[in-house]
Structures are given as structure tokens and as C-alpha cells.
Amino acid sequence: MLLSLSNYGKSIKVPREQYSSPYSVEYSFTIDDLVGDIVDSPRGAVSIQAAIPYDEWYSSKTLSRYGSWGPRSRHYSKPSAMDSWSVEKCRERVIAVGLLFKGYPYQHHHIPDWEHPESWPWKPVSSGKRGKGLDCSNFTSFVYNLAFGLKFTSDVSKQSAIGDATGPGPGTNKWIVKRIPLPEKYEDQIKVLRTGDLVFSFKKGSKSIGHAFIWVGRIGKSPDDTPLFLDSGGGATPDCNGIYVPDGVYLRPYRKKYWPYTHVSHAIRFFYSKENRKNLSTE
């Protein structure tokens, strides 16, 4: 174990495989209701994550076109039962789909299960290892795509400015999203944010957007009642037990003195009213 200092006192780093998160989620729906159509169907297959066939993932053409990022994501179809889902079910599905990738490392990739061949270029990350994984905005983009067939840019700066997403499913349909200004006060932000919102923070010392994460909201459970978010981030956040959350996809605490809050910009909401989409209740 490696001891180090954080903003919250002494915290401990442990290997990823030894980390046990104190955070959890309690859904209003069963896991099967939320993600059964993914885990029990071809939709959840690793081999179809990319826009190109699986046997081309590691081809010289892919190397030439995408370099260290690997192939881009496919555009998933609209889930067959989506029109019957409530706002709350859609919001909770965002979290449930995101947590299917819990423990995936932080990597600058377009899809979660693509791994660098040793001979390919690699953009170094905090984990210091090659392997599968996603960075923050490729994670948020992939989650909404897999969950609903809603596709939007994975560039974090451009993602923070979207007014719509393409979908559900491939084609020309557009899904209008809502930009949510966030109050300055921490407690007021908690009241405004909703489960599944995309939230964006500025880079430290800059007015450029540097991070994207997903708000967990009321379904998040923390021993100290700290609100939670879900992201693919670096390993610089200690949990409530003083253990650093590893880099990659994990639940993390939204603390007053932590960068995502101190540098927060705004949120984007995908599910919010009947005007937003048919058959969804208002809130």
C-alpha cells in the first residue's frame, strides 16, 4: 500500500483488485427491468461495440485511421420497449448501464473493450497500464448510446455544448436535451440535479471544460450521506473510508472541496417532460 496526502487528510491507495467501494445504488426498478435487454441479448455483446466489424478492430487500416483511440462506437438501435418507459426508469437506466462497466480503467478509447496492441501508439494515463477502458466523455457518450441509441460527440468540450443527440437509433431523428444552469451554492445544486444528468466541470485554472460525469442522485447510497456521481476519472478522490477510488469507472463522492464541485459548470438533462418525449411523465 502507498500512503499519500489528500485534501481530506491521509488517504491510502490500494491496488484496483483490492478496492471495495463503500458506495452503492438502490433502484426503484429491478436490475432485469433496467438492463436485462442488454446483458441477456446481443446488444450487450463486446464484439458489436464498434462501428466496424470485430475482425477489423486491430487492422492496419484501423491503426491508420484512429491511432491510439481505437475504433469509434457503433450507433445502437432504439430499445424496443423504450416508448413505454417512464422518466424515472430512463434516468435510473443511465446509472445501471454505466455500472455495467464498473472497474474498467481510465483509457483514452472510444469503446470500452478495445485494448491496445503493444506495437500501437498509446496515450499514457494515470493507471500507467495499457488495457481496455474509457475516458470521461467517451464513457458518458457510450452509456447513453448503449442505453437508448442516443449518439452524441465524445469530445468533452463539444459534448458540454450539445443541444440534441441523434436518435434514438441511427437515422436523422433528433433528441432535444435541456441545459441546466447550476446554482453556486452546493446545497442548491443538489436540489436542482436529477439522476442521469450529465454534469461538466472546468479544468483547474481554466474556463475550458475538462470533465464530464453522471449524476447519481437520490438512488445513490453513501455511509456519510454524501451525494454520488458516476464517471470514468482519475484516481485522486478518496472515499469516505479514506481509500482512494481507483482510476476508471466508479461511484465517487461529490464533496464541497473537491474539483468537480469547485469547478462545476452546468448540466445537461435528457429526460425531463412530455414535451421531451412521448409517454414520459413530467417532473
Regions found by a protein language model. Give the residues of each.
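Low-complexity, Gly/Ser/Thr/Pro-rich intrinsically disordered linker/tail segments
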Residues: L228, S232, Y244-E283
